[in-house]
């Protein structure tokens, strides 16, 4: 099978909540971005807990919203019920929690991603992060010791791309790993 080689600025591995937000942020800044997922049907999947909000996650969602993130907007479009938590306590600890229609949440996020300029979605599993050595201030001193190579100084490397299990190579300047619980 021939090796496909494409070039992007940013590669995002994973399409859960964090991967979606990372890919959207990069693409909205004008970086050519590709997001890998093992299944396009599982983009922004909520397999267990369909809630967004609460005292901890709610704070994070508000921070994302302030930075232009999509999670808060998406839950606003797809929630089936919401509840204010900790109402018997002081206003500082009140927090909103919304329960999403799990399938609609996934479909809605998928639509947003598909309609974002500079963003490509690819169904593939990344097998390897590709790097290359870069000469540091002192170079990359190597010596042979008792039959094997040893570095005299730390070898500096930079990311140059990723390789999928099918052998396709995607060159890039940076990789964001957002594999969640599936690493």
Indicate residue ranges for each PLM-predicted region:
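Conserved N-terminal/central alpha/beta ligand/cofactor-binding core
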Residues: 3-7, 24-134, 166, 178-183
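Beta1/beta-strand and adjacent pyrophosphate-binding region of the FAD-binding site
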Residues: 4-18
